[in-house]
């Protein structure tokens, strides 16, 4: 079977995350909380060892590692820094985590685990760095002086003068040696080639006269490299961005104009797509679509 996790973006310690558990036939067999008492949990990311990293989207937000079976209490990850977290993506080959920041002048961060605990990353003490991109697109990584600042100290995004800034970092995903992420302020999808330390834009709405995809937000990537992008605004769609850069709508929500698409995820077999309408018609709704429309992916 498999488990679908979903955050709760409620403020004032009313947020958290929950899980839907499915058996091998794809039948829903359980639903339960995996995190509570946190604030504005926007997005996050799965780990290769089957936990969920839930991110607080507040000025000095934190990340919590959650047991997706709901049996163990969530654990704070101070090594991932205090800032307006959006989402995370784990690169298992290099013991690294990449993180987006939802600020108009946000940064792209990289955490390197210096120790392992039972084949898992230690998120308590490691190296947190910020990306600095040159004019040609090559990336340097600069250590942050103070990854866990207090409210009266300089925020992480302003600590390194050479840091590059991104207009509203959103979803992020690791796939085949690359990091894919979105920025909502300029409606762009980016691709970072890890081995080449090279960053490029693979989708830019402003270059198109009638863009199919706007309001870019959460993303996931199928096993064959298609990028699924959920819209916050736009036409409330999930749009598939293929290897050639062509954008094709996959599904659209109608009659829920005050909501946003969130949390796209594909089942391990590749025959089910899950996503949520954050506010629906008043309360959040999670959907499942069945069909062999993709080859699959995490």
Predicted features and spans:
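Sequence/structural signature of beta-propeller domains
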Residues: 1-298
